[in-house]
Structures are given as C-alpha cells and as structure tokens.
Amino acid sequence: MIDDRDTYANRERFPGAKEVIAEDFEAAMAHLSPGESSFVVIVTRGHRDDMRVLRWAVQTPARYVGMIGSKRKTIAIFRELTKEGISAERFKRVHAPVGLDIGAVTPEEIAVAITAELIAHRRHAEREMPHMSWFHSHQGEAETEAEDSPVAKTPENQ
C-alpha cells in the first residue's frame, strides 16, 4: 500500500498490509519490482498522480494493472502517455475503470467491486469483461472526446 501522505499510509489504517509505504509515488515506485504475479491497482487522489503511476505500471510485467476513474479521464491519460512514446499496445491489459460493474456507489461498494475483479482475474474467471474494449474499438472517437479533458490540456502540452 502506497500513499504520499503519512496520515493515510500507516500501519494503524492498514494493519494487514504486507508493506505500507508513505512517500512520493515516484520515489516509492523506484523501490518496487512487480513480477508476473503482481497486481497493481491505481487509486490516487488525482489525475496527475494516476498518470504518473500508470506510466510506471504499464512498463512492468505485472499480471494485472487496474486504474480507477472515468472513461474520459482514462482516455486522456492514455493519449498523454502515447504522446510520450508509450505504445498503445501496453494499455490493452489495463482494467479501467477498475472493478466489476455491480452498480457500486459507496466507497465500501467500490472496494468490493475492485476486490471482486481482482479475484476473478486471479482465478482466471474472467469472461468477456468490457474493461478496455470500448477504448480499443473506438480509439479515434475516444481521442476526439478527450480533447476537453483537464489532463489533455495542461500548460506543458498546449
């Protein structure tokens, strides 16, 4: 469990976590080496942090990479990372929005939906889940939709 805030990343809040890291995401990621059996779930507090972590995660051999967020945010982040030179092929394994569609609304329900997807993936129980099929089948359309995204329009890339 990683968070850049001590108030969230601590043993009191996550007593069962194998490891709790409270430092900047990039510094934390520099110490991690996910393997082919690793699961990476990206749930940060902002688009920029999500993008920073996803940039790293898609370049690892992790078995599962999931990211919370809307389709619009995901499309904008994928576009930005593609502009940086990351192959669109790497995004095919990203589950976004993360979690099975169970109509979750509350934080607890969202946690259940995410956990259910992780279990399904671990147990090879995946069926045709639409996680990113909408992105790959409508990539041109999705790029147009993302034009107005706050992630797509920043001072660095305007």
Region spans (language model):
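NAD(P)-binding Rossmann-fold cofactor-contacting core
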Residues: 1-15
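Adenosine-phosphate binding glycine-rich loop
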Residues: 62, 68-158
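Structural motif
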Residues: 38-39, 64
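Short glycine-rich anion-binding loops that position phosphate/pyrophosphate groups of nucleotides
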Residues: 45-48, 70-72
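Conserved SAM-binding strand-loop segment of SAM-dependent methyltransferases
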Residues: 17-24
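Short amphipathic alpha-helix with an adjacent loop that forms part of the alpha/beta core around
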Residues: 25-36
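Short amphipathic alpha-helical segments
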Residues: 13-14, 33, 52-55, 78-80
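Rossmann-fold NAD(P) dinucleotide-binding segment
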Residues: 49-62
